Amino acid sequence: MSGLLPVAVYALKVPAGGLLIPAVPDAAATFRVSMAAIDPDETPEFEDGQTRPRATLKLIRPPADMDIDESDDDYEEDSEEDSDDEEINGGPSDKEKARKLKEAAALKELEDEDEDDDSEGDDENFDLKAAISKLVKGKAPATDDDEDDESDEGLELDEMVVCTLDPERHCQQPLDITVAEGERVFFKVTGTHTVYLTGNYVIPAEEGPSEYDEDEDDEDDEDDYDLSPDEDELVDMGDLLDDEEEDELDGLAHPRVTEIESDEEEAPKLVESKGKNKRTADSDEEMALDDMMAKDGKAKGADNGEPAPSKKQQKKLKKNNGEAAAVEQKKEAKVAKEGKEGKEGKEAKEAKKVQFAKNLEQGPTPSGQKPGETTTGTLGVKEVKGVKIDDKKLGKGPAAKAGNTVAMRYIGKLEDGKVFDANKKGKPFTFKLGKGEVIKGWDIGIAGMAVGGERRITIPPHLAYGKKALPGIPANSKLIFDVKLLEIK
């Protein structure tokens, strides 16, 4: 039933006694019956010889080979032939009104027959098939009585049992019956109780409101995309990206990174410091880069605080007084001093390594990281089911999986860098992973993240909005999201 949308409640009361009740007057709409129920407190209406209270619901319809459209054509031809007489008598007739009158007359005959207890064996004054034929055909042209009798004698109705309900053990029954618009269907109940049918009137999904329209009408819904961000949301990337967008490597298709080994490289720390500002693996790498830059700046400074001369300045000195040689000697002395300091620092770090080994032999060292907060996943670029995933920072704890409710911060961009959507402050965006509440690229790209993790996901058009154009998003657009996972519920 994924192609139909419910739009209104359908309800029908089918009384006991075998009376035929039209499913929908005039067969004017498509509907779906989802429940049949009886009232266990209702007083049973026992028929002759019946001792057990129960009700059987039946569905009745005309045979599939009955051509109702043919009767419509006959009506049109008949109306054309009599058009002159109708104009003399006061104008063209109302076909809808005539059909309703015929149906009402047929139903009245059914009710009169049901109320007459003495006429069960008498078929001379009432023809059940003829009455049903009038209801089913509805708009059939008026013919002679002999022609009606001949057509009604061949009418055989399809009668099917839907369910049997018992007020003591089985008061209701879930159903899944869809009746199309224009389809003539009747219900009747035999037994002791009235049956109540409920469901929904439905329309095709393509005629209903689009998913985007519903999101636009309810901007406060926590699962919506805010596709018209405020100006203050279009500024810098904030604490989500940490200036990673400006990285020159992002513009390269296949960047090559060369690892430089140095004597000053610290051994990997097995235990975080006990200070207030504890850092993750990524922040340690950033700190190491900052330290290298700071030491390089100190190496270029003179003892009196003056900066070392540049190559251009050295050339000028050489031309003037030949003082460049003295400068070179001074620079070599500084390098020797720094080499000595570097050697001492290396020995101190080797001592640290030994100290860590001793601690490991003595037992686990207390740490600020809890046992369950191990990092999840690996850094780098990978492709999963067509979605490009670039982990910038690994989170801690269990990985998000289908069925989890996740809280996210994100910034959405097009390939040209234009931001079309963002959630960087206030209430985070939450949704249930893997349940189709977001575009397919998000269900694929968010899976596997841990709390605190940051990644960039590049989603191809067929996993985003495809050929559908949205405000700020052209059709067939590749979308790039920088996301951060805040919480897993």
Curated annotation (Swiss-Prot):
Acidic residues composition-biased segments: 66-88, 110-125, 143-157, 208-250
Positions of the UniProt region annotated as Disordered: 40-157, 199-378
Compositional bias (Basic and acidic residues): 93-109, 267-282, 292-303, 328-353
GO cellular component: chromatin; nucleolus
Superkingdom of source: Eukaryota
Stored PROSITE patterns: FKBP_PPIASE
Activity regulation, short description: Inhibited by both FK506 and rapamycin.
Compartment(s) where it occurs, according to its Swiss-Prot or TrEMBL record: Nucleus
Record domain PPIase FKBP-type: where: 406-489
Enzyme nomenclature, EC number: 5.2.1.8
UniProt cross-references to InterPro entries, sorted A to Z: NPL, PPIase_dom_sf, PPIase_FKBP_dom, PPIase_Fpr3/Fpr4-like
Signal peptide positions (record): none
Reactions the enzyme catalyzes: [protein]-peptidylproline (omega=180) = [protein]-peptidylproline (omega=0)
A molecular function GO annotation: peptidyl-prolyl cis-trans isomerase activity
UniProt KW keywords: Chaperone, Isomerase, Nucleus, Rotamase
Coiled coil residues, start to end: none
Chain intervals with Polar residues compositional bias: 362-378
Family affiliation: Belongs to the FKBP-type PPIase family. FKBP3/4 subfamily.
PANTHER family: 39 KDA FK506-BINDING NUCLEAR PROTEIN, FKBP-TYPE PEPTIDYL-PROLYL CIS-TRANS ISOMERASE FKPA
Subunit-level organization: Binds to histones H3 and H4.
Role, per record: PPIase that acts as a histone chaperone. Histone proline isomerase that increases the rate of cis-trans isomerization at prolines on the histone H3 N-terminal tail. Proline isomerization influences H3 methylation thereby regulating gene expression.
The protein's name: FK506-binding protein 4
Native species: Aspergillus fumigatus (strain ATCC MYA-4609 / CBS 101355 / FGSC A1100 / Af293) (Neosartorya fumigata)
Gene behind the chain: fpr4
